[in-house]
Curated annotation (Swiss-Prot):
Lineage, top ranks: Eukaryota, Metazoa, Ecdysozoa, Arthropoda, Chelicerata
Similarity-based family: Belongs to the non-disulfide-bridged peptide (NDBP) superfamily. Short antimicrobial peptide (group 4) family.
Protein name: Mucroporin-like peptide
Modification Lysine amide occurs at: K38
Signal peptide from the UniProt entry: 1-22
Highest taxon in the source lineage: Eukaryota
Gene Ontology cellular component terms for the protein in this record: extracellular region; membrane; other organism cell membrane
Alphabetical UniProt keywords: Amidation, Antibiotic, Antimicrobial, Cleavage on pair of basic residues, Membrane, Secreted, Signal, Target cell membrane, Target membrane, Transmembrane
Biological role: Cationic host defense peptide that have antibacterial activity by breaking membranes. Is more effective on Gram-positive than on Gram-negative bacteria.
Subcellular location: Secreted; Target cell membrane
Gene Ontology BP term (one): defense response to bacterium
Residues making up the propeptide: 44-73
Amino acid sequence: MKVKCLLAVFLIVLIAAEHCQALFFLPSLIGGLISAFKGRRKRELGTQFQPRQKNFMRREVDLERLFAEMPDY
């Protein structure tokens, strides 16, 4: 069932891409379908957001230092 749905989506996008002559979009679509078949797209969302939060905290500290060093006008 899953394979049939993915193939149907692929064919619809293929027809739309050919109609719009957007051939540069097709390689990424084919790569996405192959990785979906192989199951590489399954990732945990929690691990993706943790490094970004650390970066945000570091940037916040850097901004506080920058504002502390700025002269008051």
